[in-house]
From Swiss-Prot:
Membrane-spanning parts: none
Catalytic activity: ATP + H2O = ADP + phosphate + H(+)
Subcellular location(s) of the protein: Cytoplasm, Cytoskeleton
Species of origin: Glycine max
Function as written in the Swiss-Prot or TrEMBL entry: Actins are highly conserved proteins that are involved in various types of cell motility and are ubiquitously expressed in all eukaryotic cells.
Enzyme Commission numbers on file: 3.6.4.-
UniProt keyword annotations, A-Z: ATP-binding, Cytoplasm, Cytoskeleton, Hydrolase, Nucleotide-binding
Family affiliation: Belongs to the actin family.
Gene Ontology MF: a single term: hydrolase activity
Entry-linked Gene3D superfamilies: 3.30.420.40, Actin, Chain A, domain 4
Predominant cellular place of this UniProt entry's protein: cytoplasm
Pfam family, one: Actin
This protein's GO CC annotations: actin cytoskeleton; cytoplasm
Protein name (Swiss-Prot/TrEMBL): Actin-1
Length: 377
């Protein structure tokens, strides 16, 4: 094996909705594909097609008509390990075209990831893929590093789950982490429901993809919902049209801000939960009184569901209303926040000081899977 210094570590951020993977030192992930595994509904539908027993990512998406699609990651946590192995195999061999036994691998995990899951990740990497070294890092810590900070509170909202994670000098504070099972997929579902009530039919997974695209292109956060509603009723400035693949044009107005508004008011989708602003505030209040000032001044947004226009302004407004009046509040929405976790991983894995964080194969063989709790962070 070549000298460890010459070999770029692999960075793999496994999200509920998308896998982001690439080589450490790059400024963006080389591979971004849906975290799905599809299996044929009927065996050998077409004779002589040389059908595979499973399809992963975009390939599964394209052939979804004949497949049953499964998401191996639910709410940020791996729930189906066989399918997860298929996703990793696809990531290394088909997307990145690298040999995992030649590169250290940095994996991300959800905050509050069960201990068993963390051990299992390392076991699969060492025993199935033969990785020379592995590190498992909490995704929110990586987002914070990507924004150039070591202390702050990260609101990470992806496709399947949102978390607020207070971090002090590089360490997440587990007692104050809060999880909210409300994220991008719920917003897409809500928009599908509104459109269905308006007489459009969006039911299949293919149509769900169209609605997700509509959400990503047209939705925005209203600074003041009441005000925005009045505007949308009296003028057409809020209305935008969207062309469906079949040429039909849909016009959406109030739905543009109503859909992501659910993040601040989960009761709109029947959830008895606090909105993202209140969850962030509650998370800060669980921390020691001496560090709250540092957290209020460094609220960092990360993940695809924080990409809505005006989200930082609204967040700032809502938290100012909850916090002590003299408190200085700063909400940071880095432009690259969609891939913030991956970028943080890329930065971290390229640092020479990071060498002591890796678990080498020899250490794993000696101590077994529980070593992941001693090293990594």
């Amino acid at each position: 094996m070549a000298d460890a210094e010459d070999i770029q570590p692999l960075v793999c951020d496994n999200g509920t909705g998308m896998v982001k993977a690439g080589l450490a030192g790059d400024d963006a992930p080389r591979a971004v594909f849906p975290s799905i595994v599809g299996r044929p509904r009927h065996t050998x539908v077409v004779v002589g097609m040389g059908q595979k027993d499973a399809y992963v990512g975009d390939e599964a998406q394209v052939q979804r008509g004949i497949l049953t699609l499964k998401y191996p990651i639910e709410h940020g946590i791996v729930s189906n390990w066989d399918d997860m192995e298929k996703i990793w195999h696809h990531t290394f061999y088909n997307e990145l075209r690298v040999a995992p036994e030649e590169h250290p691998v940095l994996l991300t995990e959800a905050p509050l990831n069960p201990k068993y899951n963390r051990e299992k990740m390392x076991r699969v990497m060492f025993e199935t893929f033969g990785a020379p070294a592995v590190c498992v890092a909490v995704l929110a810590v990586l987002s914070l590093y990507a924004s150039g900070r070591t202390t702050g509170i990260v609101l990470d909202s992806g496709d399947g789950v949102s978390h607020t994670v207070p971090i002090y000098e590089g360490y997440a504070l587990p007692h104050a982490i809060l999880r909210l099972d409300l994220a991008g997929r719920d917003l897409t579902d809500f928009l599908m429901k509104i459109l269905t009530q308006r007489g459009y039919s969006f039911t299949t997974s293919a149509q769900r993809g169209i609605v997700r695209d509509m959400k990503e292109k047209l939705a925005y956060i209203a600074l003041d919902c009441e005000q925005e509603l009045e505007t949308s009723e009296t003028s057409s400035s809020v209305e935008k049209s969207y062309e469906l693949p079949d040429g039909q044009v849909i016009t959406i107005g109030a739905e543009r801000f109503g859909c992501p508004g659910v993040l601040y008011q989960p009761s709109m989708v029947g959830m008895e939960a606090s909105g993202i602003h209140e969850t962030t505030y509650n998370s800060i209040m669980k921390c020691d009184v001496d560090i709250r000032k540092d957290l209020y001044g460094n609220i960092v947004l990360s993940g695809g569901t924080t990409m809505f226009p005006s989200i930082a302004d609204r967040m700032s407004k809502e938290i100012s209303a909850l916090a002590p009046s003299s408190m200085k509040i700063k909400v940071v929405a880095p432009s690259e926040r969609k891939f913030g976790v991956w970028i943080g991983g890329s930065i971290l894995a390229s640092l020479s000081t990071f060498q002591q964080m890796w678990i080498x194969k020899a250490e794993y063989d000696e101590s077994g899977p529980s070593i992941v709790h001693k090293k990594c962070f």
